[in-house]
Amino acid sequence: MFKTLYARIAIYSITVILFSALISFVLTNVYYHYNLKASNDAKIMKTLKEARQYEQSAKPTHIQQYFKHLGQMNYQIMTIDHKGHKTFYGEPFREDTLSQNAINNVLNNKDYHGIKDKPFALFVTGFFDNVTDNTVGINFKTNDGSIAVFMRPDIGETFSEFRTFLAVLLILLLFISISLVIASTYSIIRPVKKLKLATERLIDGDFETPIKQTRKDEIGTLQYHFNKMRESLGQVDQMRQHFVQNVSHEIKTPLTHIHHLLSELQQTSDKTLRQQYINDIYTITTQLSGLTTELLLLSELDNHQHLLFDDKIQVDQLIKDIIRHEQFAADEKSLIILADLESIDFLGNQRLLHQALSNLLINAIKYTDVGGAIDIALQHSHNNIIFTISNDGSPISPQAEARLFERFYKVSKHDNSNGLGLAITKSIIELHHGTIQFTQSNAYVTTFTITLPNHSH
C-alpha cells in the first residue's frame, strides 16, 4: 500500500487531518478547563440562586412544579432531602456519581461547585459530561426541611439541533478535505508518473520524445531539466554511435589492408615484393598501435576524476624537450623551428601537457611545406600563459576549420592520421582550465593559440 508515492502522500495528508482534529479537540478541552469552566460554574450557580430567591418569595407548595418547569427549560435537576430520598427533573443523568460528602455539605448550607472542581480529563470535555457530580448545588428551605438541589444545563437537549448540524459539518469537512487531498495528491503525482514513463523510454533508448512542461513549480523545473537531460543524453548517444562507427572504420580499414597484404605475401615469391609487403604491414600495425594508444588516452581524459594536476612544470624546458625530440622529423623536411620562450612555471599534469604540445608540433611539421618555418612563442600576459605555434602551409576551408577539433575528423581523405590528435589536445587544455584557438591569415599562415591560467604561485 505504501509502495507508491500517491498512497504515501494521500495517507500522510489524511493522517495529518485526523491528528490535527484530535489535537484541536484536546486543546479545546484544555481551554475549557482553564478558561471557561469557572465562569460556566458561576453562571449556573447564579441561575440556581435566583431560582431559590424566587421560590422563597413564592408559595412553598409550588417548588416541585417549579423544578419541573426548570426541567422543561433544558435543565437537569436532582433534589435530595434529609432522608436521602432523590428526585430527578428534566432529562435523566447518564450516571449518578455524586458523593455523599458533597450532599451532606449542601444540606449543611455549603454551596457545591462540581462544575468548577471537575477534574481535568484529556479526552472528556467537562462541559458535556452528563453526570451528577458535574453540577452546582445549594440548600433550599421547604416546609419539610432543607433539601439539597443540584443542577446543570441539559447540553444534549439544548444543543440537539446544533449537535446534528455540527456532526454533519464535521462529516462534510472530513469528506471534502480527504477528497481534496486525494485530488491534489493525484495532481502532484500525475506529472511524476509521466516523468517515470519518460524515464522508462530513456532506458529503452528513446531520446526523441519530450515531456510537456505543464507547471511552473519544482515539478515544472524538474520537467525542464529532464528535457535538457534527454537532449544531452541524445547527443551523447549520437556521439557514442558516431565514435563506434569511426573506431570501427579506423580499425577495419587497416585490418582489411593487412589481410590483403598477407594474401599477396602468401602468393608471391618475389623477395622484393615480400619485403615491401612486410614493411607495409609493419607500418599499418604501427598506426593501429598508435590508434589504440590514443583511444586509451581519450578514455582516460573522459574519465579524468583520478588525474592529478599538481606537477610543477617548467614549460619552456618542456617545449625545448619536445622540439629536440621532433628535430629529426623537421630536418627531414628542411624545416626551421624558431622558438621565443620565456621562463615560466606552471602547475598541471606534465605527462598530458607534453602530449598536447607534442601533437601541435607534430601537426605543424606534417603540414608545413618543405623548407618552411615553424614559429613557437611562450610568454606571460596578465594572469595567463600564452603559447602559440605558427606555420605556413596549405589553406584550410571554413568548413574544415569549424570541425578541426572533432574526434576522427580529417581535413583530407588522403590523410593517414587517425584524426584524434587535436581532439586530445583540446581535451587536455580544457582539463587545465585553458582554451585553444585556431586562426589563419591571408598568407596561409596557420596559428594555434593556447591560453592557460597562471596559478603556479
UniProtKB/Swiss-Prot annotation:
Function according to Swiss-Prot or TrEMBL: Member of the two-component regulatory system HssS/HssR involved in intracellular heme homeostasis and tempering of staphylococcal virulence. HssS functions as a heme sensor histidine kinase which is autophosphorylated at a histidine residue and transfers its phosphate group to an aspartate residue of HssR. HssR/HssS activates the expression of hrtAB, an efflux pump, in response to extracellular heme, hemin, hemoglobin or blood.
SMART domains given in the database record: HAMP, HATPase_c, HisKA
Protein name (record): Heme sensor protein HssS
Organism annotation: Staphylococcus aureus (strain MRSA252)
Molecular function terms, GO-annotated: ATP binding; phosphorelay sensor kinase activity
Domain Histidine kinase: 246-456
PANTHER family (alphabetical): HISTIDINE KINASE, SENSOR HISTIDINE KINASE CPXA
Disulfide links within the chain: none
Gene this protein is translated from: hssS
Keyword Cell wall biogenesis/degradation assigned: no
Reactions catalysed, as given in the entry: ATP + protein L-histidine = ADP + protein N-phospho-L-histidine
GO cellular component assignments: plasma membrane
Subcellular location: Cell membrane
Phosphohistidine modified-residue sites: 249
Record flagged with keyword Transmembrane: yes
Membrane topology, as annotated: Multi-pass membrane protein
Uppermost EC category: transferase
